[in-house]
UniProtKB/Swiss-Prot annotation:
GO biological process, one term: gluconeogenesis
NCBIfam families attached to this UniProt entry: pckA, PRK09344.1-2, PRK09344.1-3, PRK09344.1-5
Stated role: Involved in the gluconeogenesis. Catalyzes the conversion of oxaloacetate (OAA) to phosphoenolpyruvate (PEP) through direct phosphoryl transfer between the nucleoside triphosphate and OAA.
Highest taxon in the source lineage: Bacteria
Record-linked InterPro entries: PEP_carboxykinase_ATP, PEP_carboxykinase_C, PEP_carboxykinase_N, PEPCK_ATP_CS
Oligomer status and interactors: Monomer.
Taxonomic source organism: Shewanella piezotolerans (strain WP3 / JCM 13877)
Protein name: Phosphoenolpyruvate carboxykinase (ATP)
Amino acid sequence: MADGSNREYLNLSTGQLVELALARGEGELTANGALVAKTGERSGRSPNDRFIVKEPSSEADIEWGPVNKPFEADAFTALWNRVEAYLADKDTFVSNLEVGASKEHYQPVTVTTEYAWHQLFARNLFIVPTEFNAADKPTWQIINAPGFVCNPERDGTHSDATVILNFAERKVLLAGLKYAGEMKKSMFSVQNFLLPAKGVLPMHCSANVGSDGDTTLFFGLSGTGKTTLSADPKRFLIGDDEHGWAPGGVFNIEGGCYAKCIDLSQKNEPVIWDAIRFGTVLENVVTDENRVPDYTNSTLTENTRAAYPLEHIAQRKEENCGAEPHAVVFLTCDVSGVLPPVSKLTKEQAAYHFLSGYTAKVGSTEMGSTAAIQSTFSTCFGAPFFPRPAGVYAELLMKRIESFGSQVYLVNTGWTGGPHGIGKRFDIPTTRAIVDAIVSGELKDVETEYLEKLNLHVPVAIPGVDSNLLNPINTWEDKQQYAEFAQHLAESFQKNFEKYQVPDSIKNAGPNA
């Protein structure tokens, strides 16, 4: 429609957006009906290009540093105006959406995009309300202009692209980026800032619920199994990535899923496989000559994605919310092969491991990361998205666990019998059997063995799981080497934890170096 008419398309349906995306050459239809789009050189988040406007209303509550970098308010206004002027002679797509499946805690947001497929993504991942902004709250605005090229000297940005959050003006500016995940993570960061002030814990986790209403949460970084394990054929999905835990219940912050597609198989992940159909956006997935997606192909990126609305999942919780969780699972992908497949945590240990966020970058979502797998500590299992000091979130977690009596487990979806390259990764059926035992409550009062170096209690038996796997030293041929690796891991935990100002009860809840 680039005929000079400069239309603003408001609240278009899925079919209309797919039609326009194809007509405008933004993507192609695949054999399974999904729309596939390419994002160019930025096929993941760009953390170096993310800023928060430094202004009086929020300045004192933000933990400024390499994750939350300050941006001048005047420079933001000038850049916002420049991007608006750039979009003024383009067709744009606009939707009125919400973030937060809670009458009390939702945020209304108007999303304006240059691309039709970005608008489809926003409508898949955010919530399309039956009545927009029923409580008449002040509305957030997102502008996404991938064709706008930033000039660092003129605009004060880090590169030719940027993501900037402005809490005072309720604005999110995305310029120069095609990777759609930036939109969802921006509004997640917004809720991560706003919710704690209302006593609600925002969480980088997935959630599902059983037929008797029991909720389980799965925390973890990208690639650790959040989406795979929460998409359980025996349970109902609440959401796969972002939730709030308020007194009385858990709610999804989103209205869709953003699942990793690399090596996706119908056998191992039937729920995700079946959700990829007309209306789904596939990002950077390579197709063959018949337009059949090749999920094993990582030519463009390891971080291939499918964005679909929750409606594409048959077994889901209609209201996108649930009761407070009986079980909370911290997923860690241990590349050293030292951690047991499952441990039971006290509330102090839960706070310790929540703050530590130990895991590996597996098929990292960040731009420029190589395929090499490395261990990392990511505070709250999602450091890039939490604007407030980490202690704020840890305190809220302990409060919620204590008041409801949730049991927390540390589950290793990484390696055993040796580090990455020598040992082998726990297979999905083993982890599923462990998770089944957790959600059924079988592990709540199970007999445990104490691993002193790791300061962890591990079950001695779990139905459907080889008991030899439960204490990791049994899976290593060289026991001395295991002891050395365990010592090294304990030391790295302690070194990482030095930065936290927390009570001794939490400080002493980690591994013993």
